Each structure stands twice: as structure tokens, then as C-alpha cells.
Amino acid sequence: MKVGIISFAHMHALAYAKYLTEHPEAELTAIWDADSTRGNKMAEQFGSEYYSDLDELLQTDVEAVIICSENVNHKAHVFKAASYKKQILCEKPIATEIEDAKEMIQVCEDHGVILQVAYPVRFVPAIQKVKDLVQAGKIGEVIAVNATNHGQMPGGWFVEKELSGGGSATDHIVHIMDVLRWMLKDEVKNVYAEFDTRFYDIKVEDAGLVTLELESGVIVSIDPSWSRPKTFPTWGDVTMEIVGTEGTIAVDAYKQHSLLYNDADGKIQQMPWAEDMDAGLVNDFIDCVKTGRQPFITGTDGLRTLEVVKAAYESDGLKETVLLKRN
């Protein structure tokens, strides 16, 4: 199965390209990037062909594409790929605006193509085990969740609101919310959030706290801050403490690792030994395309998490709790 990558603007594209080239039933044959220098470099690195014209790439025999462009460009690239009837894996967030996300879902339905959104945390074995335990009632009725998705400040277009749609809240709320919706089979009722810029001299938020009430009454807190220093062993963390009436489960998605101490690199590094979540995401997408089944993570999942992000920004602006408007 031949696959193309549309843009390496997002750093996750590197992992997706790696796992495409390692997959026994897939090959990365085509790359487009608005940055020709970056595009040519990636094509050489992964033994692929660089296209300076996106239409030319989409006219090839690739069956599917992975879109890793700047957030604001997701809609245009999904529309174009769908028009050529290519199956689509789109980097998160699905879009920067709710109406754009809805239109992206619709255009993919109209053209009969898959729209999968890149939420790889679902593929972490420890997270999957926690989901099984929660749904089996091992901690009773869930009443609260305390979660973090901290990270290092990525810089570049991520801190340019016109390209990213926002800062750390846009970048990190969505991962936690996707896992919670999937794990608890619940939706958000209301949101209260406060954001600020505390760590860096940038024009988007890099710190904040989000408090949610789910339809079931579960209370959730999320810290989505870019608060990890450059010396942190990995890019960030994904942690959850799930409190139930009969017990508590704590999980760290990146806990399965060894530590590498190397003076030459100037920092401690985490060396993961568990299955990589990005590999799980790519494998699932390839299986969807080959079998024709619906993806594990749909465009609607992307829309639901984006709604929470937008409600959080609204709450921060109003300084009050906001009822979620589901589309």
C-alpha cells in the first residue's frame, strides 16, 4: 500500500514516516511540503519522492495520505485529498475552528474516504489496560479525574496563533479529552478554564488549568501547560489519576522506559521499551485502509475534543463556567 505525507511542519510526521517505512504492508512513496528544502530532505531521508505540487502528488497511485501541516491548513489539505479519494489520517487538532471540522467530516463522507484523527495516546498499552479496568468496574463508579499533559514549548508556528489556533491549550487538552471520552464513554457538560503566559515570551498561552464536569457528574481537571524545561528527559508527559468509589488508578503513559545518563548530551534521556503509541496509530490507519473498516479514532472524535478546547478559551475570556455547545 502506497502512502504519501502532506507536510512535515508537525514534528509527529517524522515518527509516522518511520513507522510507514517499517511496516511490511506499506511504503512511503510521496512527500509534499510547502518548504521545499525540508521536503527534499525528508524525501531523501525516507527514500521517497518529493513533489512541489500537491495536486501532482495526489494524482499518483498513493492510496492514503497523512496530513501533518500547520493546524490552520488541515481543512484545505483534507478537502483536496478527499477530492482525489485518498484515505486520510490528519494530525491533531482536526482543525482550528468547529465549522471547519464539521465541513471536513462531511466532505470525507461525501467522497467515501476515511478521516482518522491522530490521537495516539489510545494506543499506549498502559492506557488500554486502565480503560479495561475502569470499564470492568474495578474501582467502582468513577467520580473524578486529575490529568496532565505537560510538554516542552515547541516554538515555531506552534506559538503563532494564526497558524496554530492557540498555544498549549490547543496543543494538549485534546489528548486527555480524547482518552477520557473513550475510556469513560461520557461527554463534557461544562467547562471552566484559566490560561496565562508564564514561562516564555510568546503571544499564546503556555500555562493553564481546565476544570470540566461530565454529563455523568464526573469532575475532571487538566493541566495542559508547556511547563517542561529543555533538560526534561522527554518532550513531556501524559498522566491521569482516576478516582472511583472503590479505588483509584494512577497511570503515566511514558513510565515504561529506561533512563540514559550521558554527559555528552547534557541531559538525562528516557529510552522507552514499550510499544510506541505512534506505531499503534500508523498500524491502525493502514489496517483501516486495507480492510475498509472505520477508524479507531474518527473525525467526530476530533470534533468533540475541539469543542472542549473552544469552550475552554471562551471560559477563560468570560472568567466563568461555560456550558458546552455540541454540534
Describe the residue ranges of each PLM region.
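N-terminal Rossmann-like dinucleotide-binding module
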Residues: 1-45
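C-terminal helix-rich "cap/oligomerization" subdomain common to oxidoreductases
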Residues: 5, 26, 43, 56, ...
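Active-site loop of classical SDR/Rossmann-like NAD(P)-dependent oxidoreductases
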Residues: 11, 270-282
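Predominantly a Rossmann-like dinucleotide-binding segment in NAD(P)-dependent oxidoreductases
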Residues: 11, 121-202, 319
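Rossmann-fold dehydrogenase core element
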Residues: 103-120, 140-145
